[in-house]
A protein has these predicted regions:
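C-terminal motif of bacterial Sec signal peptides marking the signal peptidase cleavage site
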Residues: 1-3
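Residues within mature, well-folded domains
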Residues: 5-159
Length: 159
């Protein structure tokens, strides 16, 4: 039985050579956008500081995902790693620091289906935050990319 891999998010953040060129004190928000594209989420601090969060996930179906007669939806899921890179900006929009982390994430197929249905019905805060930030820095906002990123953000907050 072969495994089915899926990927979500920004593949660029896996590239250590590319990311190593991003230097604190030298990079502005528009420069980071040009290097890595639109972030998955944007969070603001109390003194106009902010952080841009980029995520990438690669996941494989578990053995239960292939169960016959629709049982895979009920008992199957995906196992994978989520790589997160967070870039911290000062109040002038200059990069101060960057961090990365990797965490394991299991997502059940049934929960994924539920999140997809909810995402089509609800408004999504991370998409709004990213859209607002793109307006502030004068860069285009990709709503389709934001919707895909929202699914990963939701998986991290609910599974």
């Amino acid at each position: 039985m072969s495994s089915c891999s899926v990927t979500y998010g920004n593949k660029e953040i896996q590239d250590e050579v590319l990311v190593a060129k991003i230097k604190a004190g030298e990079y502005s928000k528009p420069m980071l956008y040009e290097r890595l594209g639109q972030p998955s989420d944007v969070k603001s601090g109390s003194n106009r500081e902010s952080r841009w969060i980029y995520r990438f996930r690669k996941a494989d179906n578990d053995m239960f995902a292939y169960a016959p007669m629709g049982a895979g939806l009920l008992i199957g899921g995906k196992n994978g790693d989520v790589l997160t890179r967070t870039f911290y900006f000062n109040s002038n929009g200059i990069l101060e620091n960057a961090t990365y982390s990797v965490e394991k994430l299991y997502t059940s197929n049934l929960m994924s289906l539920g999140r997809t249905i909810r995402a089509n019905l609800d408004s999504n805060d991370s998409q709004k935050r990213v859209e607002n930030e793109m307006k502030v820095i004068g860069k285009p906002f990709d709503s389709d990319l934001a919707a895909d990123n929202q699914k990963l953000e939701d998986a991290l907050s609910s599974d």
